[in-house]
UniProtKB/Swiss-Prot annotation:
Pathway per the UniProt entry: Nucleotide-sugar biosynthesis; GDP-alpha-D-mannose biosynthesis; GDP-alpha-D-mannose from alpha-D-mannose 1-phosphate (GTP route): step 1/1
Gene3D superfamilies per the UniProt record, alphabetical: Hexapeptide repeat proteins, Spore Coat Polysaccharide Biosynthesis Protein SpsA, Chain A
Record function comment: Involved in cell wall synthesis where it is required for glycosylation. Involved in cell cycle progression through cell-size checkpoint.
Official protein name in the record: Mannose-1-phosphate guanyltransferase
Origin species: Aspergillus oryzae (strain ATCC 42149 / RIB 40) (Yellow koji mold)
Keywords attached to this entry: Cell cycle, Cytoplasm, GTP-binding, Nucleotide-binding, Nucleotidyltransferase, Transferase
Gene name of the record: mpg1
Amino acid sequence: MKALILVGGFGTRLRPLTLTLPKPLVEFGNRPMILHQVESLAAAGVTDIVLAVNYRPDVMVSALKKYEEQYNVKIEFSVESEPLGTAGPLKLAEKILGKDDSPFFVLNSDVICDYPFKELAEFHKKHGDEGTIVVTKVDEPSKYGVVVHKPNHPSRIDRFVEKPVEFVGNRINAGIYIMNPSVLNRIELRPTSIEQETFPAICKDGQLHSFDLEGFWMDVGQPKDFLSGTCLYLTSLAKRNSKLLAPNSEPYVYGGNVMVDPSAKIGKNCRIGPNVVIGPNVVVGDGVRLQRCVLLENSKVKDHAWVKSTIVGWNSSVGRWARLENVTVLGDDVTIADEVYVNGGSILPHKSIKQNVDVPAIIM
C-alpha cells in the first residue's frame, strides 16, 4: 500500500520550535512527530510513503533514511515549487500514488491519534466507493467543518457544513483519508483544496464515506494544542499501562502521566506531573515543580523552578526559582535567569531573558 503525508510549509504556527527543525522532526512524546505516523503506516502494511513538502526537505532526508531501514518502507519526497494546498500534492505525486489500483492513505502531518489504518483500509474495501474520511466527534462543532450524512445511511456523506450556527452534527474531518487512485482524475496540478473542491465533488457522486475514530485526536500544529495533544497521548498510554511512562511509584511522580527519557537526571524532592514529557539528557534540579509541560533534549530546569503549560526548547535553561506558565514556548538555546517570571508567549532561539514577562509576548 501507499501513503502521502501532507507536510506543507514553514510550520509558522509552531514557532519558535520550527525555526530550528522542520515541524515533522519536532519531538512529540520524545519521538519526531513524523515517526509516530511512519511507524503506524508500516504496521498497517504500507510500503511506499510520500512526503509532500515545500520547505527544507534536505534537513529531513538524512533523518528519515534510518526510518526506511528500520521499518522497511520507501520514503520519497515530493517537493512543491509553490504551495499546492491540500489536493495539488496528490496530483504532483501521481506517479507513485497511481502506479497501481490499490488505494492510498492521505494524512496531515499535524494529526496525532491512535491511527486506525488497518481498520480504515478494511472498511474502505468493504464499501467499495472512491473515498473514506476519518471523522472524530467534538464538543463544539460550531468551530469546525461538520460532516453531514445522507438520511438513513450511517457512513455515506451528503455534504459538509462549515462552522454551523445551528446544530447539524458533531463529527468533523480528522485529517486522515483513504482514496482510490481514480480520485487523481478529479484533481488538477495547481493550488487546490481537497476539503473544499475534491471532497464536495466526490460527495455529489455519492462516493464518499466516513469512518468514526475511536480514542483521542488532536491537531498539534500550534503550541497550546501541542500541549493538549501531549496530555491526550499520555492518557492513552496510561490506559494501556505503557512501559513508556514512569511508574507512579517513583518518588517524583505526582498525578501520573509522566514520560522520562532514561538519560534524563531528576533531582531530589521534585513534584512532576501530571502530563509531563522529559526528553534525552535533560537535567531537572532539586525541588522543581513540573506540570503539563514538555522539556526537549538537553534542556535544564534549575532548583526550585516552577514550569507549567510550557514547552522548553532544546538546550534551553530555566533559572532557579523561575516561574513559567500560560503557554510559554522557549526556542532553542534560550536562557531564563534566576527568579524571572514568564507569563506566556514565545521566546526566539538564543535569547537571554533577565526581566519578567508579565504579559504574553513574542520576544525576538
